[in-house]
């Protein structure tokens, strides 16, 4: 996996090749049954209309809210843009929402390029530090492993 992290306080860019078509990647990003297997056990659901909501929840009864956001743009299976506000820590929840952009490009031989940009982090320095560590790397490694092997990373 290729990772580029620039200006940690404002923009983080991650790129990786996944042996899967864009439709498979899109489904894995947007469907709670998939996200639960690689996104720290959270079930992430999207209302894929502009202004729609993003909710990531955990727990047997799904009562633990982890992340919330608003869908800004959805162009299946190529691009998804949404805001991001972490709720699992009171300090993070008190910060301004940031933005996450997922872009999926079809490549050759069944391989696609996934680019994830987490930006607008100027008002969310603790979030920036939190996701720059193992955060996005773990999530994206888990996504790649799941799609390529059919099994979760851990």
Protein language model features and the residues they cover:
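Beta-strand/loop substructures that line and gate deep hydrophobic ligand-binding cavities in soluble
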Residues: 90-137
């Amino acid at each position: 996996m290729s990772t580029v992290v620039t200006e940690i306080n404002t923009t983080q860019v991650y790129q990786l090749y996944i042996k899967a078509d864009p439709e498979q990647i899109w489904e894995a990003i947007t469907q709670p049954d998939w996200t639960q297997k690689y996104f720290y056990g959270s079930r992430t659901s999207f209302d894929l209309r502009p202004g729609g909501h993003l909710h990531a929840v955990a727990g047997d009864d799904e009562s633990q809210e982890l992340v919330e956001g608003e869908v800004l743009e959805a162009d299946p299976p190529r691009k998804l843009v949404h805001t991001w506000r972490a709720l699992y820590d009171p300090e993070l929840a008190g910060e301004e929402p940031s933005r996450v952009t997922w872009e999926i490009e079809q490549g050759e031989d069944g391989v696609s390029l996934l680019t994830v940009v987490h930006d607008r982090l100027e008002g969310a320095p603790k979030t920036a530090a939190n996701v720059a560590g193992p955060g996005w790397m773990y999530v994206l490694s888990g996504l790649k492993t799941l799609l390529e092997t059919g099994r979760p990373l851990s």
